[in-house]
Curated annotation (Swiss-Prot):
Taxonomic source organism: Schizosaccharomyces pombe (strain 972 / ATCC 24843) (Fission yeast)
Protein name in the entry: Meiotically up-regulated gene 190 protein
Molecular function terms from GO: metal ion binding; phospholipid binding; protein-membrane adaptor activity
Annotated localization: Cytoplasm; Endoplasmic reticulum membrane; Nucleus membrane; Cytoplasm, Cytoskeleton, Microtubule organizing center, Spindle pole body
Biased composition range(s): Polar residues: 1-11, 84-112
Gene: mug190
Residue span(s) of domain C2: 451-576, 636-781
Residues binding Ca(2+) 1: D485, D491, D544, D546
Amino acid sequence: MSTHSGDSTKQQHYRSSDPYSGRRPIPTIPKFFRDRKQRAEKKEEQQREQTENEKLFDPITQRDVEINDVHFDYAKTYDDPSFTVPNQSIQGSSLPSEKPYLSSNQPTNVYKQHQDDLAPPEADNQITRDVPISDEKTNILFFPSPSIDLSYVSKEVKQKTGQYSLFAYIFSLVISWFFTHSIIISAVLPLAISSCMYLWMQNIYAVAKDAEWGAEQKRGEYARLNLIPESAEWMNHLLEKVWPLINPEMFSSVADQIEDVMQASIPSFVENVRVASLDQGSHPVRVVSIRSLPSGEASESFSEKQASEAEHKDEPEQQRKQFYNFELCLAYHAKPVEDATSTSARASNLHLRIVFYPGIKGTVGFPLPIWVEIKGFVARIRFRCELMPEVPFLKNVTFSLMGLPELNVSAVPVAEGGVNIFGLPLISKFVNDAISAAANEYVSPKSMTIDLSKTLLGDDIKKEVNALGVIFVHINRAEDLSKQDVNGLSDAYITVGFHKFGKPLYCTRVVKQDLNPIWNEYAFIPVFPDQVKAGEKISIELWDSDRFSPDDVVGRTKIGLHLLIQDSGKMHERCDTLTGISEDTSLPGRVFYEIGYFPRAEFKPSLKTSGHDITIPRSMRDDPAFQNPHGSLDNKEEEAAVTTAPDEEYPSGILSFTVHQAVNLQMNHPTGTFGNVSGNYNTSPAQSVGDVTAEEGSELPSSYVCVDLDDTLVYKTRTKVFTSNPIYNAGSEKFVKDWRNAMLCFTVRDFKLREHDSILGVVNIPLATTLTTSSQLTKWYPIQGGIGFGSVRISILFRSMKLKIPRNLLGWDIGTLEFMDRQIVAEGTGSVSDVSFSSIRVNIAGVKITAKSSTSNSSSTAEYHVRSRHAVIPVNNRYRSAVVFEFRKQLQRKHNVFAMVWLVDLEDNVEQNIRVPIFTSSKPAHVLQNMIDFDHPDKESEFKIIGYLSTRICFHRGLDDSHEQLVDNDDEAAIFETYRCLKSMGLRRGYVKDMKNPLADQRASLDESRETTTASSKFESDDSVDTEDEETTTDRTPIECTQTVSMVDPNVNGDIQGRNSLGTMNSNERNLEQEFISLGYASKNRPKAHAQEGTNQPGASENVEPVLADDSDAVTIHSNISSDDQKRKLVNADDRELEKRLHRGPYNSKIVRTGEWVKDGAKMGWRNLRRKFALNGRQPDVETEISK
């Protein structure tokens, strides 16, 4: 589908397997109003051009068609349908007889013209009439058979055949005997002549019958070509019998979609809304008409994506692809109810039961149940069926509405024990608009495709990512920008996104008061097919950040997406002049950047496996109950996705995740027994435990799911109110820099009023230890660590991109910086007095620590000591942050002596000795904000190097306890609470350590041993190695791990590591676990990081010695505290956090939790107020399926 929201009539196409996401948001009522207004404006414009109807692309017939929103009277259409039919088709017509208007004896052109005259709606009222069929249902031909009647001929021939044959026999017998007097001739000749006469007469009878049936076939062909509808009373009669037998659960997806639309469109005074049920009743929908549509042009109408796929398919497969198109007109009118207070009487019609929760957001709310009855509707739908030779003979079914359906609903409150004496017109209109907004998503040219071959098999698993590739942008710098502020400078930042889409997908940091900013930042933008179809362009916009007014556009530049795709796989260095809204308008300034498009990488055959879970014992792997579901596999790419592990050669790629549904969600309510225990033999009954006994109820959680990727919130689903089995079907696709160290966490939360949303449970998925034998996995995961119970079904899929980025860019954006030896050494180029100060203030994105001067053992250096409790500094935006060392004296507050190192130059979990210049500058703001190269500075950089600073630091990936001081909003608080939850369960040990795919190590050792064996065999005999056997071994060995592998995660505490089903480990497992426990094995063979050519590495020293960080327990802000009292306080703090999360202790009281919510709300409100007056860029929002 197109992501350009400005044109609602643009062709959009969905598949039933596509979940809701930021690219496919839930439709809302305001968006529906905008789309309807745009269609009305376009129709008025066409009418001004003497066009009757709106002409749009029909995805069914692949032609341009004229569509109209339905404005029929649904009651009249349902109760008194009438159709225009030819007079001669009506038996017993009272009209005077006349010459048939349509006859098979007419010439072809006249015959077709008369067919068109009889085809509705251009019918001639002189030769047609409207026939009501409500009183007496009948199957009527809406187009007459040609006026050819051979029944009297057939009857006459059948009667005279015997007489003529007997006459011929007697006549030939007399003649033959009179002339020959031969007994043989007189016996044979009359018999032959009479037989020929009989067969000839029978042939005339058969020809007459063929001509009569040929006329009917000809009528059907012309009726189909002229789009003539046929009566569907047989189908209505069938619906009357089948309709009450349909399971209402079949309409659950429709109810879920209506609920999503209302949830995304509710006003501010309504907190939540829930569709409790949708029932079809016993009164069926009527099929008004059905007609076949032409499909001959289907083979010539491929979309761009289908055309590209067709190039890789066999020609016979393309030739045998067939389509069948038809149009269906439906009408419904509610049956009158005699007793309006009778629930059973009202339930006979199509209805919904909706519960609104009005109130104040997060504070007050109460349920308001509403009974919604569908009074009637009229809809016209077109279907396109793709046929295939295999069972079930239907591949894809595409449907599209030919105009917005006419709909009317009524809503009344559900008053038990009372009489409903008033209706709710506002709610009726809201529900009506919500249903119309949902239907508007399928009005032509939009459409939906359902893969019936997979639906019948229950296949909803995604086995290919939607993204075609990724755009890699290196934003370097800008020069000579225009003056935007009163001081003649500019607070510049850059956003990267798609031009037509408009929404920024990446935003750089703000460089304050500078006309020549240097960012040196990197952006990764996934590219999807609809963006290629829409002719999108990559837009790089430069903005000026203002504190009290909207940001101003400094300029922009664009580059066509198709140009990058044509020259893919490499970076293009560009220097573009800024332009205005029009590309013809030139603005001051230039922007320097590199950009390139990198497509998907193919699956590597050498990584192919059986796809089995290697943690399961080998004897049980072939059991279907222990195999991962993968659905139907339609092509080699889908088969490779479920049997091929991700490629470590291309660690960067697209990660697709989908949250399908959750089951048996339940909350644990810890309460006291409120009883007395007396006597020695007093026993208490067992408590009630087990599965959930109800699917709906006020005691059940209102759940939603937050998705964290590398400790960053990337997705949030909608809230499903008061249900134990919520269906989300929501997901997204995100770019992952390094799948080997990526971690995906799903947090299921319960929406609460007047308190923080509780954690029901979490699911933590490290990709390296999860995607061991395949790139796709769909699995039920139990949630744990929270106040609830249940399971959630999750699908993940990773697809590598042909992109290799420098090692220093593969890390996480969130982590902690640690001073490993607690020492900072300053060395002066001239005299040590130039760098000898009382202290050094270390500043990282607003987090400051102080290093005091200490006694130096050398007269040429000055040493500074970092306290242990200040040795770890939390970092939230690592790739846009720098470590600034400011040299200070006690009596002077401001100094002009600095040193700095950018965190983009560091690798994750690698200790590095850094040596950076100590400088003084007349323009310190320019040097400290811009990423400059001290060896090759720009023209605006003015500094003097007076010494060098040396220290040993390490950037640890992932959250730490010290990040609590950086929490500024609710989303960050939720992420930090999830981290605390994982840590309390033993699934996190401080920072995240390097992870490794266990089969990758086995492959590496196997390849090494195979190379050794092959090399040694060459000295013995050249013919000793059989190529075929070698290939067989190469393909077979990686398929199955010879023993059960223990999936050891270095981030999990050792006491909870997994074991096999027998509780013991063999020698191979023990060796493998020891290899994983040692981080040195995971990274000791990694090559030394080198900077990418052309990138600046400011302050990078030549004698940097990367050393892998120790794998002992992660160093946190509390790791080096020696005081027993302080350690006791920290233990108590952890206990309080556990009680708070599990609602135990004092937090079991609602009043205490509400007080905590008020206190944290005030704190967050103050921080948000301060952030309002800060200079920030247009950062992308957290993705959700609810459009904003």
